[in-house]
Amino acid sequence: MAAKQVLFSDEARAKMLDGVNTLANAVKVTLGPKGRNVVLDKAYGAPTITKDGVSVAKEIELEDKFENMGAQIVKEVASKTADVAGDGTTTATVLAQALLTEGLKAVAAGMNPMDLKRGIDKAAAKLVEELKVLSKPCSDTKSIEQVGTISANSDSTVGKLIAEAMAKVGKEGVITVEEGKGFEDELDVVEGMQFDRGYLSPYFATNQENMTTDLESPYILLVDKKISNIRELLPVLEGVSKSGKALLIIAEDVESEALATLVVNNMRGVVKVCAVKAPGFGDRRKAMLEDIAILTGATVISEDLGMKLEEANMEHLGTASRVQVSKDDTTIIDGAGNKDAIVNRVNQLKANVAEATSDYDKEKLQERLAKLSGGVAVIRVGAVTEAEMKEKKDRVDDALHATRAAVEEGIVAGGGVALIRAQKALDGLVGDNDDQNHGIALLKKAIEAPLRQIVSNAGGESSVVVNEVKAKEGNYGYNAANDTYGDMVEMGILDPTKVTRSALQHAASIAGLMITTEAMVAEIKEDAPAMPMGGMGGMPGMM
């Protein structure tokens, strides 16, 4: 076991803060309408240019192990916020940095770290309650468009596309983002279905960058049982191999031996194949397999109907124009099923929804209905260069997540104003002792940081703007895009409540943990021994 170095108290916390500052300073330049780009070096190909906070955070690894620990912990804030809300990563990082900087000063001054943490936790809970009070529902197309525009760094075209996509497939519908062929952004709505089961092995992935499997015009085999023996699949595999097309297998499960054989055949290029588990459980699984069968024109191979897998042939397979499989879900686009059969199935599901007695059954039936009838909206991002394409695709992804979050939990005034307005909820909040009160005051001050950073990135004087905004009430705030003050909601500057709430909760949680850190342990870096000198060349032979 390698020797370890241990740092204690102020020395440990100072190192940790250095790492946090390095990461946060790189991330926070992207915040707001006048945020700047960050260029990320890649091992292969051109550098990536981005304004996406979490993309910047993910790239940062520091040489000093103690500083790197601090950076990695704050990276977790950005990643967790992105996972939960899909946006707000930069806001979360800025909040965590502000809290930690002031919190460590308080610890150095002799305050009790645990009481500071308890004060921060109390204040965070109160602020979350206040954000819910300030939140307004986001249901109309105009609000959805405004949220999308702000999250895409004030790109109104993106906001319009997302609002249009949601209008076409419904707020629960599936919307995907792809790279387009031309310079213009496009919206395509295609019949499709998505379910929450991913590939059974990562070796099926065809796109190594985002670990997805893309199958063009594949055959689709539906099996209502476990596949344990590869021999059962041979007739189908041989037929598909001769056709030169790909095969998607949807089964209850594929056991290890059969799965290993499929993976090997796939990697050798014998037959392009991907296996996924069937969605749902029990009777619901059978019903969902039947839905997929109707959508794709397949026949479910079911022993209940007296069918055996080894008797299956090409006639039992369905087709679709495209299938995309990730580690978490599968999307079948433009299935080749009979249109009349699909309409009949949709009508049958509508009747079942009307007859359902339990809320749970009703909800599950409505999900199936949306998947069969809603289709999939595809936003194709256009750009002049590949670097611009990647940057824009990241922004559209962010905006899409933000609009979904807005529909889910509502919206608040953007531009850091909601957090400033929530400050008043902390006025009457008192902790159990002075150190807890200081923790409450820390968070009260730290939540001004996002607005201060937006102003700084726009080249303004942050203290002047913060005091001006605090002097007024309601949605009054600062529009950094054109250096004006006014009603943020009327100006269309909105943030999803879920994004602001998640950023605040994750930042407070991580900052509390880091403030209460007393020791850090890391391996001692050993310098690699110098290479020995090469031997000298021999003398040429003499006559």
From Swiss-Prot:
InterPro entries: Chaperonin_Cpn60_CS, Cpn60/GroEL, Cpn60/GroEL/TCP-1, GroEL-like_apical_dom_sf, GROEL-like_equatorial_sf, TCP-1-like_intermed_sf. SUPFAM superfamilies: GroEL apical domain-like, GroEL equatorial domain-like, GroEL-intermediate domain like. Its EC number is 5.6.1.7. The keyword Kinase does not apply. It is an enzyme of class 5 (isomerase). It is found in: Cytoplasm. Transmembrane segments: none annotated. Keywords: ATP-binding, Chaperone, Cytoplasm, Isomerase, Nucleotide-binding. Forms a cylinder of 14 subunits composed of two heptameric rings stacked back-to-back. Interacts with the co-chaperonin GroES. This is Chaperonin GroEL. It comes from Francisella philomiragia subsp. philomiragia (strain ATCC 25017 / CCUG 19701 / FSC 153 / O#319-036).
